[in-house]
Structure formats: structure tokens, C-alpha cells
Amino acid sequence: MTQEVLERSIQVGGRTMTFQTGKIGKQAGGAIFCRYGDTVVSAFATGSAQPREGIDFFPLTVEFEERLYAAGKIPGGFIKREGRPSEKAILSARLIDRPIRPLFPEGYRNDVQVVAQVMSVDQDCASDITGINAASAALTISNVPFEGPVAAVTVGLIGDEFIINPTVEQSEKSVMHLTVAGTKDAVMMVEAGAQEVPEAQMLEAIMFGHREIQRIAEFIENYRLEALERNLAKPKQEVVMKQMPEEIVQAVKAFAYDKMDQAVRTEEKKAREEAIRQVKEEALAHFAEQYPEDSKTIDKILEDFVHKIVRRLITVEHIRPDGRALDEIRPISVEVGILPRTHGTGLFTRGQTQVLTVATLGAVGDEQILDGLGLEESKRYMHHYNFPPYSVGETRPMRGPGRREIGHGALAERALLPVIPDENDFPYTIRLVSEVLESNGSSSMASVCGSTLSLMDAGVPVKSPVAGIAMGLISEENHIAILSDIQGMEDHDGDMDFKVAGTSQGVTALQMDIKIKGVSREILERALTQAKEGRLFILDKMLSVIEKPRPELSPFAPRIITASIHPDKIREVIGPGGKTIKKIIDETGVKIDIEDDGRVFISAVDGEAGENALKIIQALTQEVEVGRIYNGRVTRIMDFGAFVEVIPGVLGLSGKEGLVHISQLAHGRVEKVEDVVKLGDDILVKATGIDKQGRLNLSRKEALPNPNPSSNPNPNGITANRNPRNS
């Protein structure tokens, strides 16, 4: 049987991206085998035949499956198979979800599942970018009514040059890591981390990426047309939208629209929610007898009224639900140092959004080890975001962090990363935890502000303070409104959530999600400009409370002492089976981390304990210098000489000793060793050399003054200090 396969390629960033269909996954709605360099991602898109009943949302799920065989690895542990998705996989799934979600028909309620499976990894060709393009192509050739295609690229910036899909080496030099996704017509999604890049340059980078996206999107569209000709793509599913009965719509509108309009204008969130709830209850009770089977329909009509009223108020009347101007920021309250024994705290309140961020400083060994499909790395700065149900007045089971929490934590982490001090200047592991205590929108950006406050309160020498703001967009007919510091209702009923974080000098992080079919350059430019104004306002509020990092660390934070030893001496500090280093830790109560290059990090809450540990390590690794005179102690007497310890032992371990041959004890002839020295004597000796076996040779004779028979009654120098030396 002949197998029909369609394979086409396009050059992206100087490398070949190949799309293939017809060979694998033929029972899926659409299947694409995508190779970019040596990275291979297979994407499968499948939709259900019928809509899911009784829901008011689009049931789209996106899975990003990492297989360790893709990197030539076997999973650890007893089970030896992949478990829960990694944080990287969750963030990659979100990257795919966000640009494709707005491109399904409004009101479409069929289940759709997109699975991107990483099968081979080339570190220079990112699997998440490959996954977005593969998923878009799979949806485009499937029967799912997807209004794409979309495409995605990463943009780097080295000097003044933008680079599409930079390699690992280029990424290390780049001051920007920007992911852009979009259609041929508009930008759909932006995700960025940057080193204080100016807004104008960030905008140019987005548009530079979009020009490459247009080329890839057109390629995918042409690929679909060719696949259709060969029966390798499927006709799109016909979408039948459930229409609201016009009679009920008009009846509900006549009874409830004006009441709902007044309810929406209530400024305080909880009072507004209660007012809207009362209008709904009143309407449902009023129509219970007339339309007894249509309570869900009536509830949906009322929700649509809220949506339309919010949008009309903002775009036509320029009135926001809480009464603010379009560019006005909610009242801000800032506090630091509110927890007594933590290392640093920042409480940031903006309107009805409140976040407490706590900073904890740890030893080098507290770094997070990342061992996924990429190279094994460690992370010394991390941010974790928690969004409990009580923050929005709800109850639900509290389990582990969800995708949203992981995504928000990663965004806030990325925003502060450029201002975290270098390890050489501040050798601490830093963990931030943001607890959302109250939320009415923009909690991730409040976490950014809280992070800056907690770091400065902890005495971390951040390079610049960072603040964040969430911008919104409502586009209604010929009216466009860009909102600063959006709250929950504006996010829910708006068209864009554009989060911007940065310093006074430039942007450090961006994230844009939209619900419409894209945004133009003009809108992006206006949003970035307005966001900068808001960010500078917020920074002023923060700096009025804590202007710069505290000069001293918290008394409860560990003190880290750094030292450097020769790499060959590492084994002497560690000892057989780790015995020596365990003794040091038990004796002093410190934490010790040793890098392969010989850097030693001693972490101790008690500074004296850290100094004691350092002295022990210095004693263990101290080298005997040939030619130097030492005050040593006689440890053994032999017929042929005396063994002398020149560097004392520590922790019950032997020190460094060498042999003073009998011929080197004195200037004259010595018949018997005991005539010159006794066990336990402290004597001056000179290190004269180290033989091929690593044995140390010492000489007492060379440490003595030159003999002068006329003035020295004891030319053999047969004297010794019988007093025990200080050890």
C-alpha cells in the first residue's frame, strides 16, 4: 500500500524547519511531524464531534509532553518513566495555548485537545517555538474550525542587531529573550525577558519578529492548501451556534438592562458583585413562571448584558467600573519588614489587590537543580506565586500550584532576574514567595512590586528597583480604550491583558494575551508608553517607603564566607566518604558548599562559627612552603631522625609532618636523636624539599644560626624548647 506523505520546508533563522504529514498519527484530527534543526516535535490536534452541553467556556486543553529519550536520558528513580510535567513543559504548554485560543469561533463549545510531543532535542532549536508552529500546522490541517494559522519566533538582541531564534551561544550574549506569536495580520502573543530594554526598541523587536511570523504563517496556509489537494487535510467542521431566543432576550432586556447598568457602576468590587447578583436573582424570579425551563438562558443573557455594559461604559462614556480615569492607577499602599523573623518582606497593596512577598536567603547548596531535556543547570534565584481561594472570597480544595500559578511565578521571576546581583558579589541563593492575600486583578504585577520591596528589605543589593503594571484594551466598533492597572472585571470583559515590568530605565519583562484576532503596532506603542508612565508612578510610591536596599542583612539570615582552594585539595576537605566535611559541619554547625573550581562557600547564621570553619579548611588545605621556617612539634622519634608536625592537625585528623634526618638535627655530629630533641618538643625547622613520593624533608640545622665557635659554647645547638607549643 502506497503511503501519501506531504513534506515541505522553510528557512527560519538560518535553519531549516520541515513540516510533514501523512506518515504518523493518521487517526488524529490533524498530525504534524515538525523538525527544526535536530529538534523534533510531533503535534496532534483533535476535536470532539459534538459540543459539550451545559458549559459557558471553550474546553481547549494543550499538553506539552517532554520525553527524556529526546535528550538521550533515562528517567531517575525507581519507576524509570516520566511523571508530572516539568515547570518548563507547563510554561511551554501555556505558550502554545495563548496565541491559538482566540482563533476559535466565539461560542464554540466542542472539546479540543492539542498535544505537542518532544521527540528529539537540539539545544540551538527551541522545542517550545517548534511546538507552537507544529501545533498551529496540526490545527490548520485538521477538521477543527481553527481561524489561523499562527506562527512564532524568538527574537534576541546583540548590540543593535535583532536575531531570529538565537542559538544557545547567541542567547548568552543577548540582552533580550522575546517570544512573539501571531497571524499574518497581527500580533497575538508576546512573552519577554530583557535587561532594561527601552520601550521603543522592544516595540521594534516585536514588529521584527512579526515580519518573520508573516512568512511562516503564509507557508503553513499554503501547506494546508496542498494537503487538501492530496486529501491529507480535512474539511473544517461546520459550527452551529446556539442562538438565544429573541423573545426572551428582549423580555429580559426590558426588565433588567437598566438595573444591571446601575449595578455595574458600583465602584467597590464586593458591593458591585452583590448588586449584580441581586439583579440576576430578581430577573430569574420574575421570569420563573413565564420561562420555567430557561433559567440558564436567562442567566447567560444577563452575563452578556454585564459584558456589553462594561465595554460601553469604558469606550463611550470613559467610565471604569470603579470610577477611575482610563490611565489612573488604584490607591497604593507599601510596607516592608512586617514579619519579625523572615529575611525580608514586602506588602504591596493596590486597590483591592494585595500581595505579601517574603525573601529568604540561603546557601549555595540551596540552589534548584534543573535536569530536564536541556543541559543540567542550577537556579540561584527563584520566585514562587501562590493564589489561595480566600483571596477572591471563594472556597475550593487547596492542592499544588496550577498552571496559572506557575506561569505568574515565572513572569515575576523573569522581571527581577536582570537586577539580581551577580553570584561573585552576592553568593546567596534567593527564594521569593508571593502570597496573594486579596485579588482584584494584576496580582502578578503586584508580586513584582512586592518582590522588589522584600529584596530591598532583606538587604539584597539589587541593581535597580522593578515595578509592574497590567494594561488592558477594549476595542468596540470605532472606539478603542487602553486602560492602566486593570482590575478583574476589566480583564474578564476586556480584549487584552498586557503586563509590563521594568525599572526606570527600561523593560525587564513583558507578557501579552489577547481575546481578539490580534493587535496593531499603534495599539502596542500606546500601551507601552502608557505602561511606562504608570510604572514610574508606582516606583515613586515604592521608593518613598524604602529608597535603597538595607545596608545590613537580617540578623536571621545566614552569613556566607567565600574562600578559594586548589582543586586538588578538595578531596582533603571532603575526606573519605565525606567524613572530613561532615566533621567540620558537626563541629561548627555551618553549611559548606564546594565548587569544582575550588570555590568554597561557608554559610552560617553565627559569624564566629563561619570563621572557625574557615580556619579548619585553611588548616586542612595549607601547603608547606619549601624554604620557609616553621615552629614544629616533634611527634615521633626514630633511630634515623625525628618526625616533626609543622602544620597542626584539626578535628582529630593528622596534620602535615616531615622528617628531620639525624644529619639535619644540628651542625655537629649527632650520635643519638634524643640528645637533641625529645617527643613533644617545639623546635624551629626549615622545609627543604618534597621528594617524589610527596614526603616532606625538614632541617633543624638550616633553621639554626651559623655556628661560631668563639662565641657559641654549644656548637651542635643541642637545645630544645620543652614547653608544649600553642596549638
Curated annotation (Swiss-Prot):
It is found in: Cytoplasm. Its EC number is 2.7.7.8. InterPro entries: ExoRNase_PH_dom1, ExoRNase_PH_dom2, ExoRNase_PH_dom2_sf, KH_dom, KH_dom_type_1, KH_dom_type_1_sf, NA-bd_OB-fold, PNPase. One of its GO terms (biological process) is mRNA catabolic process. Keywords: Cytoplasm, Magnesium, Metal-binding, Nucleotidyltransferase, RNA-binding, Transferase. Belongs to the polyribonucleotide nucleotidyltransferase family. Involved in mRNA degradation. Catalyzes the phosphorolysis of single-stranded polyribonucleotides processively in the 3'- to 5'-direction. This is Polyribonucleotide nucleotidyltransferase. It comes from Desulfitobacterium hafniense (strain Y51).
